[in-house]
Each structure stands twice: as C-alpha cells, then as structure tokens.
Regions:
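Glycine-rich, aromatic-bearing surface loops/beta-hairpins
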Residues: 137-198
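Central antiparallel beta-sheet cores of small beta-barrel/beta-sandwich binding domains
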Residues: 41, 46-127
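Bacterial Sec signal peptide processing site at the extreme N-terminus
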Residues: 7-27
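Surface-exposed interaction patches
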Residues: 108, 116-139, 145-152
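Amphipathic hydrophobic-ligand
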Residues: 51-57, 131-136, 160-162
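Sequence-level preference for short, compositionally simple segments enriched
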Residues: 17-19, 57, 63-64, 138, ...
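Post-signal peptide N-terminal segment of mature Sec-exported envelope proteins
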Residues: 22-41
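N-terminal export leaders
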Residues: 1-2
Length: 198
C-alpha cells in the first residue's frame, strides 16, 4: 500500500509473514500515524537488486466517520505522477480493510504490535498512458525512532516480479515532496541529490 507500486521488477526475497516480523513495541497505530502529512521515499529494484525507479510521495490523512481517508500522490524519477485516494477501516481483532479508486476489489490485512501486513490487487501507472494490474503484499514495520518502513512484494500473473522499499516519515506540511521537486532546476534527480546532501 501507499507508495507500494512497481513494474518490470524481480526479487529474490523470501516470503515474509506478520508473525515472523511483529514485535510488541513500539505499537503501530495506523490511523494515528497517517493523520496529517506524511512523506515517503523509496525505490524499485530489479531482479539483481539494482534500483531502477525512485519515487517520493506526499500523504494527507483525515479521519472521517471512524475511518481514515488517505490522499496519496507519488512522484516518480521518470516524471510520471500518480494519485489515489484510500479509505482505511481498522477493525477489531487485528484486522482491517481498505478501498481505493486504483484497487480491483478491496485490500485486506492484519496488524499486530509494530507490524502491519496487507494484500491487494492494484492498477499501477507505468507510463502516462499505460497501466498494469499487479498483486501486492505489503509489510510495514514501525521502528523505535517512529520511522515507518515498508517492503512490498509485487506479483504479475501470480509470479513475484519485484520488490519496493519505502520509508515514511511524519511531517508538518511545511515541506512537501512536490515542492522539493518543482523548485529544483533539473527536475526529480536534482531534487534527490539536494535532499541527500542536506
């Protein structure tokens, strides 16, 4: 979920489970974490583990009728921009579901301790005029410093074809990913270099 998009990738990762990843602390409260502005950055790796497509993203969460509405915009290194709106319903007994305009069916998942796992099928923009339908498995882990890390296993025609690595950090909306990119001459790559040097 949430910056978990990819294309023409391959991964050698072994299958993960929430039981194998979860720890008791810190407790990951998805609704609380994604309230307000959250920024994401990450990359897609090919079958040899080489990064092929970088991205950054802005997320804005608002609680509505007990659910979290999450507005996501991703900016890719090939100048493709992708937006979607999520509605996340955190249920009892460690389960949740989510809907989005990009999903085929609903996303479903579980959460425990500092971890969350989710599976879904999504239409992903791989170019401005082309989409693929991909299966996704997300594994999110909240770290002691309250940064959030996500590994997404990606499937096409039932075969795992890639992995996405994403890190989320809370922000106050004063510096959005979109603004960092657009104010830097030279575009996305220049903006990434500037962010790393800061």
């Amino acid at each position: 979920m949430l910056a978990g998009t990819v294309f023409t990738l391959a991964s050698g990762c072994t299958d993960m489970t929430i039981e194998g990843l979860a720890r008791d602390t810190p407790t990951f409260d998805f609704r609380e974490y994604f309230q307000g502005h959250t920024r994401a950055s990450g990359w897609f790796s090919d079958r040899f583990g080489k990064p092929r497509r970088h991205f950054c993203g802005d997320f804005f969460g608002t609680e509505k009728n007990g659910k979290l509405e999450l507005d996501e915009t991703l900016f890719y290194s090939d100048d493709v921009t992708e937006s979607r709106l999520w509605l996340v319903d955190l249920q009892s007994e460690g389960k949740f579901s989510a809907t989005s305009d990009s999903l085929i069916g609903d996303a479903t998942g579980t959460f425990s301790g500092n971890a969350l796992a989710m599976i879904y099928t999504m239409r992903v923009k791989i170019a401005e005029d082309k989409e693929w339908v991909l299966g996704m498995k997300d594994f999110m882990l909240l770290q002691p410093d309250h940064s959030l890390h996500n590994i997404t296993q990606v499937y096409k025609w039932g075969i795992r074809i890639g992995t996405v690595s994403t890190q989320y950090t809370r922000h106050d909306g004063s510096q959005m990913c979109r603004e960092v990119i657009t104010r830097q001459s030279g575009g996305f790559s220049r903006a990434l270099d500037t962010e790393k040097a800061a």
